[in-house]
Amino acid sequence: MNPIVKSFEYGQHTVTLETGVIARQADAAVLASMGDTTVLVTVVGKKVADLSRDFFPLTVNYQEKTYAAGKIPGGFFKREGRPSEDETLIARLIDRPIRPLFPNGFKNEVQVIITVVSVDPQIEPDIISMIGTSAALAISGIPFSGPLGAARVGYINGEYLLNPTVDQLATSSLNLVVAGTKAAVLMVESEAKALAEEIMLGAVTYGHDQQQVVVDAIAEFKAEAGKPTWDWTAPVQDQALVAKIKELAEAGMTDAYQIEVKQDRYVQVGVVKAAAKAALVAENPDVDTREVDNLLGSLEKNVVRSRIIAGKPRIDGREPDMIRALNVLAGVLPRTHGSSLFTRGETQALVTCTLGTERDAQKIDSIMGERTNRFMLHYNFPPYSVGETGMVGSPKRREIGHGKLAWRGMNAVMPTAEEFPYSIRVVSEITESNGSSSMASVCGTSLALMDAGVPIKTSVAGIAMGLVKEGDDFVVLSDILGDEDHLGDMDFKVAGTRDGITALQMDIKIEGITKEIMDIALQQAYGARVHILNVMDQAIGTHRGDISAHAPRITTIKINPEKIRDVIGKGGAVIRALTEETGTTIELDDDGTVKIASSNGEATKEAIRRIEEITAEVEVGRVYNGKVIRIVDFGAFINILPGKDGLVHISQISDERVANVSDHLEMNQDVKVKVMEVDRQGRVRLSIKEAQEKVAAE
């Protein structure tokens, strides 16, 4: 074994790249470390292309092993199962910037597997995973236009911080991940606490500048450890076929893209393509129909892009900075705790909000430690939203990613547990889609939360920006359609308030996106965001003054912490009886805080009354309504409070002489008793005759 090792300082940590020892049968394997966080990245590519595919078959699998954190998995089988949400999100984070760096026409299957084998609880594994992936692809010999760098940027006390630790991130107003090559930014993913556009853009620039040390180090690593580049050449286009397709379809395609309604437009585009294809097959039965399909797709792309660059109206007739028509409704469903219907053009989200107790919060046990998530946002994209049929079931990677982006957009304005002691689940059902459904989910979530009475700090809106760039000419598009996303050069999603940005996601497909272009996009997005917020505020401008009548109302009381065991009871018998008999949900904290949740106010009052009885202290001199629970020769034992009994001595039953207790009292008889004394051992002495005298005096 001849290991090749490259180490360099990166921010607060030392990064080490090593190859030549582990997983030597893969095309490339790199053991990448940042501090004590270590990942094994392997790359395998098939040497033969699958020409039947019309896409690049790249798979990125990211897996966290519990042994990396010195843990044994839970569950019956005691081994890792399907990918967690965090694993899915990091796999997408790695996939997005590397995919554009493979050459057009490359159809060989490539699989990247990232395995976290050691983790420092202060160093997230995502950045080193991206660096390790870039290094492995660089040395694999597979055609790849890297190296790629990656950085996390924080913002604390007005200064940017490179690759902050977990503890530092907790106090940071920004958590931004940026990836790019030496020349260009390719991907941004971020969450922020309503920061200004210039701060966000500065963070992107700072992260890209700082990660050049990674790009340079991987280039040196490749020079020492790289395998020979594959003998692959891009497929050459048949220029005669290109010209023929242009002659047959360009005019029809141009006319089809004058149709503003998506479904009608798609039908006409399909007609144009089918006619051109039929004409080509009639002329030459041996023509490669797959190549024809690809060239028709390229023609379609050129038609749309050339119109936009020429300054002509967009597909649906809008100018570059125009927003589609908005229709905003709050409170659209009768029994949900909060709901909204947000429609922007042909994109629509039906969003619901459900309130629950602390017990309903999501418990997450990852290799980075345990955490509780009180605010959950789930995004669903059913096939009918785009007029198609398809499988319905567990959420796909895209749905998980879009839900997390919307969550990031809202998280900065959510109330604390002290301000609003509820768990909150939002579900965004995309009922129509033609571009930027994740940003529609942000808008719909803001509305649904307000409708549910959740005291969010302010409204939040989201907008998706696009870009078409040819040479030095470029056009930034506001509120892009699905076609403009697919055919454009950039997908730039921004969520935020009137005061600043709360989430920013950017995916760039080309090099040459300058700081000027990003600045224009951010400023244009700000104007669009404010316009949408103004329309949203007309539907509901602030949270409702009260929660839904159908939502559980949480009432908080305090008891003596020493009394908690009395409320719980032996084996949980007391609290179980309380919840079952009152129909409430009861949660107890070690400090004596008791939270009672119920949508029925009377049930809550009854639960409070019974808890107060259980935890009440016996007061000397007070008269209680008691029940006879045991009769003995020298008196009777009376229950005066739950778990609190006292003795009425035979001499305290009546003013008259009592020879036989049973002549005056019987089991389960209700009697009034006065507390005469509580001794040091907690024994309670009661009197019936004193109680009668006190009642008579009153």
Curated annotation (Swiss-Prot):
It comes from the Bacteria. Its main location: cytoplasm. One of its GO terms (molecular function) is RNA binding. Mg(2+) binds at D485, D491. Its cofactor is Mg(2+). This is Polyribonucleotide nucleotidyltransferase. It catalyses: RNA(n+1) + phosphate = RNA(n) + a ribonucleoside 5'-diphosphate. The gene is pnp. Belongs to the polyribonucleotide nucleotidyltransferase family. It comes from Shewanella denitrificans (strain OS217 / ATCC BAA-1090 / DSM 15013). Involved in mRNA degradation. Catalyzes the phosphorolysis of single-stranded polyribonucleotides processively in the 3'- to 5'-direction. CDD domains: KH-I_PNPase (cd02393), RNase_PH_PNPase_1 (cd11363), RNase_PH_PNPase_2 (cd11364), S1_PNPase (cd04472).
